[in-house]
Every structure is written in C-alpha cells, then in structure tokens.
Amino acid sequence: YRYVLDFIAQTRKEAKIDLSYGCEGFLGNYELSVRDYPFFCQAGINVASVLNDGSISGCLSIRSNYNQGNIYKDSFVDIWNNEFQIYRNRNWMKTGECTSCKMWKYCEGNGMHLRDDNGGLLLCNLSKVNWIR
C-alpha cells in the first residue's frame, strides 16, 4: 500500500505525467503528496449520483441501503434539499476505532463507500498507512 503511495508521490514530484490518488479516503501525511487537495468525501454534500435503476445516491460506489430516493418516483430537488442527512452529518460515524482518533476532524470517518450496510468501518486508510512516516 505504501509502495503505491510512494510511487505516486515520487511521480508527482518528477512531473513527467499527471498522476493523482482518487477519493479513497484520508491518508494522513501522504495527503498533499499524492493528490492536489486534502481528502474530503463529497458524496451527498456537493455531489449526487443517479444510478441506472433511478436510485439517487451520494456516489456510485456507495452501498444501496444509503440511497435516498428514486428519480422515477421522487423529485430530485426535494431529495437533495430534504434528504442526505446521513451524508451531511457524519457524527454517526464516530464509533469503533474512529471514537478516539486524533485525526477525526480531517478524516470524518473516511469515505461513505468504506462503510458496511450497518455503518461499520470496513477500512481505515489512515491506520493502513500508519500516518507517522
């Protein structure tokens, strides 16, 4: 995992190709060396997705039980203005290993796509990279 992040950071320094790490989650000290902006899961905050079945979600990668409505039955504007609270207030994510994490204010529980059907954290990117290098 660190090998890939180190490769991306080095490639960006060399500036021979444009390379950036996607929205996979908070990476601690790697943040600005592997992407242009610090991690921020925009799902349901300033990004929404309509899936092929009409489901309205914050992101195509998020589990279906986090869908907020359906474009064939619901007004997108109403859904956007009145739903998505689970995306916009992430305090419910501050459980398990996130409860005492000193980096919570930067990470806010990682990306929504890294949560299981019950809201449990599937992967903590920060612990995977061991944020102190």
Which residue stretches match the model-derived regions?
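Flexible mid-to-C-terminal extensions adjoining Fe-S/redox cofactors in radical SAM and related proteins
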Residues: 61-133
